[in-house]
Structure formats: structure tokens, C-alpha cells
Amino acid sequence: MLKKGQKFPNFKLENQNGEWITNETIKGSKTIIYFYPRDNTPTCTTEACDFRDNLEQFNGLNVQIYGVSGDTKKKHQNFIAKYNLNFDLLVDEDFQLSKAIGVYQLKKSFGKESMGIVRTTFIIDEDGVIIDVIEKVKVKTQIEELNQILG
């Protein structure tokens, strides 16, 4: 998994509207890119709604937010509409970026093993360098932790 101080890798992912988001898109402001397993699941919904409810505060710090999962554009569109999300969700259907940064891993859930995205949040500076990484995110305390990191 990528660590603090490393450069976030080059990427090109579509958002829910089919617009391409790349390293150039995020350059010039701090960025939170959070990786989550799946739209419309309880914990993922709580996490997305927490970002929605705190977006104005992050924007005030010149921080942009993107969520990334393996869901399709259509699923992202539905998720955004259902919960009135106010930030972009990026499509990583083939898990290319998730694999490159090390968040696509073997997971255990209810005694079953499967490959998938492990909930992880990257905080990236204006030049694309990772300021910090929150691994094994605890959704209940993530916003508070991000506030401490971003000062």
C-alpha cells in the first residue's frame, strides 16, 4: 500500500457523468480520495453521507473530495441521487487504480474470503504527494481524524 510521502500514481478514471478525472484535475488543491467497497451498503452509505455533510467545511480548506469504488457510472448516479451526494464518485470497475495503490486485497467477511477494496482514505497535497493515509477506516471517527490531519 502507498504510504505518506509517496507520490500518488498517475490515474484516469471516469466520474458518474462520464467526465475524466486525472492527476491534472486534482493538481493545485489538497484532495481526499477515499476508496470504499460498494455503493448502497450501510457503512459505505454512512461514509458518503458524512463527506456530504462536511463538504462545505472541506471546501473552505481548499480540499476536494472523490470517492472510488468498482461500481458502474449508473450505480454511482443512483447512489448520488438517492443520498443527494455533492461530490464526484469515480469508477474503477477493473480495479486498476485500487490494485496499483494496494487497496484491492483479500478480505474476510462472515467467514468468507473474497477480493475487494479495503476501505482506505488518502489525503494528497497540491503537488500529488500523499500527506497521510487512513487504513482500515473507522467511519464513525474518520471526519474528526481528517480534520486533525488537515489542521
Identify the function of each model-found stretch.
Residues 1-151:
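Chalcogenol-based redox active-site neighborhoods
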